[in-house]
Amino acid sequence: MKTIIELITDEIKNVFTECGYDEAYAKVTVSNRPDLCEFQCNGAMAAAKAYKKAPFMIADEVVAKLTDNKMFSKIESVKPGFININICEDYLAGYLNEMSETEKFGYFNADKEKTVIVDYGGANAAKPLHVGHLRSAVIGESVKRINTFAGNKTIGDVHLGDWGLQMGLIIEELRDRKPELPYFDGSFTGEYPEEAPFTISELEEIYPAASAKSKEDAAFAERAHEATLKLQSGDKACRAIWHHIMKVSKADLKKNYDNLNVHFDLWKGESDAQPYIDVMVNKMIADGIAYESQGATVVDIQQEGDTKELPPCIVRKSDGAALYATSDLATIVEREKLYHPDTYIYLADKRQELHFTQVFRTAKKAGIVAPDADMRFVGFGTMNGKDGKPFKTRSGGVMRLEHLIADIDEAVYEKIMSNRTVEETEARDTAKIVGLAALKYGDLSNQASKDYVFDIERFSSFEGNTGPYILYTIVRIKSILNKYTENGGSTDNLKITAATEESEKNLSLSLIKFADIIDGAYKDNAPHKICQFIYEVSNAFNGFYHNNKILSEPDEAKKASYIALISLTKSILEQCIDLLAIECPDRM
C-alpha cells in the first residue's frame, strides 16, 4: 500500500511531466504551515532555475491541470511559487478504510528480508543493572522490534561483559572468605559442587568489596590478575567458579530485564569470542593488516577523506592480552560464522564512537566482513539529574535500575490514588505498568544521541508529552468502545466516512502518517520519531473527543464512522507502543 505522500506525489509527477518538467521536482511533503494547507510542493521554485521561468508561472501551470482532481479539496499556487494542497475528505476516508483492512496498516518495507544483529544491553556479569544501563536496554529493544516489524529476521544479543578482571577479583575474594571450598584445594580431584557457593545478593556484595580491596592491596590485585589469566587459560577450578557466577548472574539479569519488558534472543558474552581471537589476530599479521607498534599489535584505520587523525586499533597488548576491540572483532567472526548477518546495529554510549569506528574499519580491512558491510553505531547520550550531571542517588552513588523503577512506580501510584477512587491492589498493578511506560517513554521520546534530564515529576504526569498521557488516551478509547459494545453496538465492518468538522479531519490526517513515520524510525534507528507521532495522534484524538459527543451522536451513520475512526486510532497507538516495548492497562 502506497503512503498518502506517495499517492499525492504520483498525481503531481504526472502533471509536471505533462507540462514538460522533470518529475523529480514534484516532491510533496507534509505542510510546515498547517494553518495554510495540509501538504505542499515547492518543486516549482527549484524548477524555475532549470527552465528559466518564474516559479509562480510553473506552479500556476501545474495547478491549472489539477483543479478538478478528486483527490484534492483545494490546490492552489501561492507566490513566489509554492503549491498548497488540501486532501479531499472522501479520499481521506477511503484511504483510512484501506489502512484498517491492510496488514500493518499499509506499512510495507520494499527491501528484501535481512538478518539483523542488534547488540544492546551492555550488562556485566556479577554486577547489578544501574541507571546507566537503561538507555541501551530500552532504545535497543525498540530498535529490535522496529526491525522485526519491518520484516527482518532480527537477533538481539545482550553481549555480556563476562570475561574480564571482575572475575578474577570475585574468585580471589571468595578464596579469602571461604578458603575451605574445594575450588581452592589444590589436591582436590573430584567433581565440583553443582550448587553455587553464593547467592545473587552475596555476589553483588562480593564484587564491590573485592574491587575496593584491589585498590588498596597490591598483592590482592596481583592475585586477581593471575586468577583472571588462569580462568582465561582454562583452569578447571576457576572455570567452575566462573560457571557459578554466570548461572547466578544471568538468572538475576533476566529477571531485571523482564521487568523492563526487554528480551534478548542471545545471552552470549565476551567469553564466547575467546576461541576465535588467536586465529583472527595471527591471520591479520600474516595478511600484513596488523603490525607491531611499541610492543602492541595494531591495525591502521585511517582513510582518505578523514578530517582528523584516528588512532590505530590495538588488537593485542604488549603483554599478549586482548582488549575490548579484540573481543568485539572476534565476536563478529563468530556472528559471521553462525548467523551471516546483513546488518549489525550496536547501541552504546556515544562516547564509544571512536571504539566502534576502529572495530568496524578493522573488520572490513581484515576481511571479517565485506568492505561494504552494513555496520551501524547508535550512540546515545546521558540520562542526567536536574543538576545537569549524570543521574545519581541522593548520597551521590550510582542508582540501581530496580530502585529507579520502584521510585517512579511509587510516584505514579500516588497520583492514581489522589485522583481516582480505586482499590489499592489495582492501583499498584496499574502503577507498575504506567510507571514503566513513564520511564521508557521519558527516555525514548528524546533523540537517542541527546542527553536528557530525568524528571520523575514530569515523566509521571498524566498531561503533556509523557507515557502516562499516551496510555490514558488509549484507555479512554478502550472505555468508549467498551460502552459502545455494551449498549449493543458492534465494531465489525464499520466504515469511516468523510470528516465533517476540523478536529475529525485533523485526527484522520495524523493517522495517515503512520507508514511514513515507521519507515523513518526504521531507516534512522530512531524510536523518538514514533514517540512524536503517537503524541500527535493522542493530541488529535483528544481534540476530536472534546469536540464531539461520540456515543450520544444522534446520527447513527456518523456515530458508526466515529467508532470506526477511533477503533483505528486505538489499533495504531497500540501497535506503536508495542514497538516501544510499552504495555497498556485496561483501566487507569
Describe each model-derived feature in a short phrase.
Residues 94-99:
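Short, charged, solvent-exposed linker or helix-capping segments at domain edges/interfaces
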